[in-house]
A protein has these predicted regions:
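Cyclophilin-like peptidyl-prolyl cis-trans isomerases
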Residues: 2-8, 15-182
Length: 182
């Protein structure tokens, strides 16, 4: 219990030296989302995300799967670029290796950012999702990489997908630019 409280406190704190992401969103949602990354909880995943952001790999990537009351997923740097074949969005990854799971005691609550993966727990790569609401069934099953500290109003405005799959049709919202912050 104490460990869980310490991890949650670390995620909620905003120390000046913490690594984060600044995501400029464009589409139905317009604005900036700021995320504090949890280097102490998932160091390997945070390293990969920040490297991809620094390379510009996330720039122009759409929110391809957005489920009302659950989460908004993005980060397919292979097939999820605006202007690409959106039927393939969500099936790609980066050229970097997949990551071993870094599960923790951190709960998937509103604003928590987690890594997307296939059925294999060690298959996370570049895709991530932001929670609209708590999802305790994900706890201990997916890697938590951070928490939104500013811009949940922007997250809430992201264009929703259709039905249970959450596949976004038409013109999806996108991450116009993603930069690493200190």
């Amino acid at each position: 219990m104490l460990h869980k409280l310490l991890v949650m406190a670390a995620l909620m704190a905003s120390p000046a030296a913490a690594t984060g992401l600044k995501i400029e969103v464009e589409g139905e949602a317009n604005g900036v989302i700021e995320i504090d990354l949890a280097e102490d909880v998932a160091p390997g995943h945070v390293e990969q995300i920040t490297a991809l952001a620094e390379e510009g790999a996330y720039d122009g990537v759409v929110f391809h799967r957005v489920i009302e009351g659950f989460m908004a997923q993005t980060g397919d740097v292979q097939f999820g670029k605006m202007g690409g074949d959106m039927r393939r969005a969500g099936t790609g990854k980066s050229e970097r290796p997949n990551l071993s799971a870094e599960f923790s005691d951190v709960s998937f609550e509103r604003g928590v950012v987690g890594m997307a993966r296939s059925a294999d727990p060690d298959s996370a790569n570049s895709q991530f999702f932001i929670m609209f609401a708590p999802a305790p069934h994900l706890d201990g099953q997916y890697t938590v990489v951070g928490r939104v500290t500013s811009g949940m109003d922007v997250v809430d405005a992201i264009k929703r997908g259709d039905g249970r799959s959450g596949a976004v049709t038409g013109q999806p919202d996108m991450m116009k630019s993603v930069t690493v912050t200190d």
